[in-house]
Each structure stands twice: as structure tokens, then as C-alpha cells.
């Protein structure tokens, strides 16, 4: 299955191969140089590469790791109490790394009781296991858990945006060439700018649309744009009839993406 899904097939396996600002990349290279992985909280927008970096760090250090998705509310608590606890409490015989690693993806989707349980696990298994949490909104992580982690924010600012977008554009061209998919370069640029820095969404959209054999302007009409400024303007003016129209017209968009766009516009 991973050979079919582009996001998995072309997922970077090393920190060097990850598309990130140099300042962020240096942080993880320093961890590689010391051979140590601290408990970490990786915060930033969806699709920017938080989980990819966590996996790449483990791969390069040869650390055994176990991934749990915090969005799986139904089974998450049982998975943490059983599978994760068993993983964290045993010593790896096949790895030379100092610690095992548990990656909690989308940790901001977990409840307070789960986060307090994870805090207890950090202390209980400190000698054998490290925890890496990823989140879109770090303010949703409780202070007792937050304070036990080194926080790395995946923020891309100012001039870095153009540089990082250009690197992803080249990576996207490479992937499309490998997959033998024709593409209009101007369309790719517009697509990247539209969803920056959500690389996962760009790649998923390209793969979905590539079934026709070519990526052209049609992909830009395949999903609706989100005019967040219109929403904020109407809210400030208390024009609630227009707000309702905006909500209805954006029902098909992902909730997390909408919230992120609004959050970024406010801050």
C-alpha cells in the first residue's frame, strides 16, 4: 500500500532530505550528532512534515519506534494502555539506540485524561523510552505534558517561505517525472502557493488528479478556495446572513484546514 500512496512512497528518510528551514533542520541535526532524542513536542500546521521528521530522526539513529494517531478516539486509550505500554517497558535487542521512541501523532486531538496518562508514562519509562508528540495547536497540550518536552515549532516565515516553496516545487517535479505524469508548471506553482505549507495535501491532490494522466488547470477547480478574509470581515461587521452563506459554501472543506486558515489570519 505504501508503494502506491505518493506521500508514503516519497516520504523523506533522513533529516537532510526533509524540506525545512535551516534553523529547524539544525535542531534535529544536533540531536543526531549527540545520538540523543529528548521528549519533544513538534507544533505546526498540517502537512508541514512533523511526523516525517520524527520518523526520519528515529531511522537515522536506529531507534525502534511506534506510532499512535491521537485522532483515533475510539481505540486510542486502549492502545496507549496496552500496546504502547508494552512497547515502552521492554528493552530492544535489535537496536543500538539508547532509547525506544513512541510517536503520538495529532496529540492535540486527545483529551485531558489521556494527556495526563501520557505524562505519567514519560516519567515511568524515562530510562527506556522517549516520546515525540506532534500537534497543530500547542495550546491544546496541557502544561504538565508541555513542560516535559522540548518544543520545536515548524514555523516558516518571511523570506524562508519562497525558498521552501521553491524546494518543494523541485521535489514535486521529481515525483511527477518518476510517476510519468505530465504537469503544467504554472499550475503546480499556484497549487503550492494555495496550500503552503501543507505539502501532504498538495501531493495527495496531485496523485488524485493524475489519474487522467496530466495535471492542468482543472485541478485548481477540483476543490474550493477558502476566503477567510471574507468571513472575518462579515463577522466584524456583524453581517451574520453572509456568515451563514460562507459556512454553507465551505462545508466540503476539511475542518482542521479551515480552523488553521482562520487561526493564521488572526495571528
Task: Label each PLM-derived region with a short phrase.
Residues 166-267:
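AAA+ P-loop NTPase domains with strong preference for DNA replication initiators
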Amino acid at each position: 500500500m505504501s508503494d502506491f500512496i505518493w506521500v508514503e512512497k516519497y516520504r523523506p528518510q533522513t533529516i537532510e532530505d526533509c524540506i525545512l528551514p535551516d534553523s529547524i533542520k539544525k535542531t534535529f541535526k544536533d540531536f543526531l550528532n549527540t545520538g540523543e532524542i529528548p521528549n519533544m513536542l513538534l507544533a505546526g500546521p498540517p502537512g508541514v512534515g512533523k511526523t516525517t521528521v520524527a520518523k526520519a530522526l528515529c531511522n537515522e539513529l536506529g531507534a525502534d519506534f511506534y506510532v499512535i494517531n491521537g485522532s483515533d478516539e475510539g481505540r486510542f486509550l486502549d492502545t496507549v494502555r496496552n500496546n504502547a505500554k508494552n512497547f515502552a517497558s521492554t528493552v530492544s535487542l535489535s537496536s543500538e539506540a539508547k532509547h525506544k521512541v513512541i510517536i503520538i501523532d495529532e496529540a492535540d486531538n486527545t483529551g485531558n485524561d489521556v494527556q495526563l496518562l501520557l505524562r505519567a508514562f514519560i516519567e515511568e519509562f524515562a530510562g527506556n523510552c522517549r516520546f515525540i508528540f506532534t500537534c497543530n495547536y500547542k495550546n491544546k497540550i496541557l502544561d504538565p505534558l508541555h513542560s516535559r518536552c522540548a518544543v520545536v515549532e515548524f514555523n516558516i516565515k518571511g523570506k524562508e517561505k519562497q525558498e521552501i516553496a521553491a524546494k518543494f516545487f523541485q521535489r514535486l517535479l521529481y515525483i511527477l517525472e518518476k510517476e510519468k505524469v505530465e504537469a503544467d508548471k504554472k499550475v503546480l506553482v499556484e497549487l503550492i502557493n494555495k496550500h503552503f505549507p501543507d505539502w501532504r495535501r498538495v501531493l495527495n491532490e496531485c496523485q488524485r488528479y493524475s489519474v487522467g494522466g496530466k495535471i492542468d488547470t482543472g485541478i485548481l477547480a477540483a476543490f474550493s478556495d477558502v476566503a477567510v478574509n471574507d468571513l472575518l470581515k462579515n463577522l466584524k461587521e456583524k453581517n451574520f446572513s453572509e456568515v451563514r452563506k460562507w459556512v454553507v459554501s465551505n462545508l466540503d472543506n476539511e475542518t482542521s484546514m479551515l480552523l488553521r486558515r482562520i487561526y493564521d489570519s488572526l495571528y
